[in-house]
Amino acid sequence: MSQELNSMFSPHSRLRHAVADTFAMVVYCSVVGMMIEIFVSGMSFEQSLSSRLVAIPVNMVIAWPYGLYRDAVMRLAARVGKGRLVRNLADVIAYITFQSPVYAAILLFVGADIPQIITAVSSNIVVSMMMGAAYGYFLDYCRRLFRVSPAAPVSAQA
């Protein structure tokens, strides 16, 4: 039992890694998504709130897979170079290629029409590019808060 608890709270714990990634995604996507939907896409506050509420459980399900996907993209990018530009570009590519299809499905589910979906997803892509690797930095910050090991080598325990 003691070993199980120690491994659960280890910096290499899958549970700790998943919780950190989930926290980061729910917070970031709620704030940024609502701003884009209301101020750029022209969605009503009610539509955006519905979208964000639907997105929370979706983000909880996809957060850790996204974190693993991002880590894989970052490892591939590290083969190209170690500089900040390569890292930022890899973060943007990982975020856009993983999140855009999920975001479009959420908007469709909450009743946004096709032009709103196209505008919101396109705007999200542009904003993601303009903000650089903001989510990647936020994710890394949350992982540090949760004391998850950098580059997240995940153990087989808990």
Curated annotation (Swiss-Prot):
InterPro entries: Ala_export_AlaE (IPR010574). The chain crosses the membrane at residues 23-43, 53-73, 92-112, 117-137. GO terms for biological process: amino acid export across plasma membrane. It comes from the Bacteria. GO terms for molecular function: L-amino acid efflux transmembrane transporter activity. It is a multi-pass membrane protein. It is found in: Cell inner membrane. Pfam families: AlaE (PF06610). One of its GO terms (cellular component) is plasma membrane. Keywords: Amino-acid transport, Cell inner membrane, Cell membrane, Membrane, Transmembrane, Transmembrane helix, Transport. Exports L-alanine. HAMAP family: L_Ala_exporter. Belongs to the AlaE exporter family. This is L-alanine exporter AlaE. It comes from Cronobacter sakazakii (strain ATCC BAA-894). The lineage of its organism: Bacteria, Pseudomonadati, Pseudomonadota, Gammaproteobacteria, Enterobacterales.
